C-alpha cells in the first residue's frame, strides 16, 4: 500500500485521517459508556458530567497550545493562520484534560479518583487516531527521521524513515493488556490512569528523539518538556512504584 493513503471515492479524495479521528472520538466514548454500565461508579452522574466537561475544555485548550508550541513559528498569511488554528497534539490534550478534570473536581468538591474509567477508552481513541496518522504518511508530523534500520519505511517522500505512528500502535497494544492485567488485581482506585499517563508520556519522551523536530529547547522538543512536566506531576506515584518493586 502506498503512503500517504488517499482513497478516491466517486471522484472525491477522502481524508482518511479526519475520518479516523472522528471515529476515535465516537468509539472511545461508546467504550466509556459500555464500561461505566458495567462498573460500580462511585461518582454520581452529575459530577461525572462536570468532570467530562472539564476534561473536554482542558483537552481542547491543551492540544491547541501544545500544537502551537511544537513549532511556534508562523507567518501572517492565510495559509499559516489556518495551520495555526488547526495545530493540535494529543499530548497537550491529555495533560490539558488532566488539569481540566482536577479544576472541575475542585469546583464541585469531588474527591474520588475519576481517571480509571477513562483510561481504556482513551487508549482505544489514541490507537484509532494513530492508524490515521500512519496512513497519512508524511502529511502528518508523526513520521521519524531517516534511518537504515530494518523498520524503516517510505512514508511518502521516498526516504526510509522511522514509522513513529506504527511504533506507537505496537506500544499501545502492549500497554492496553498490561493495564488490563493490573486492573484485574484490584489495585487502588486511580492508579490505572496514573500508570497509563506515566507510561505513555515516558514512551513519548523517548520516541521524540526519533522525530525530525525543528524547534528545540536545550536539545529537546516542547513535547518532551511537557512529558517531563507530566512525569514530575506524578513523581510520588513513580517513587511509590519503585519502592514497592524494591521491597
Pin down the residues of each PLM region.
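A feature for loop-to-transmembrane-helix boundaries and adjacent hydrophobic helices
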Residues: 1-247
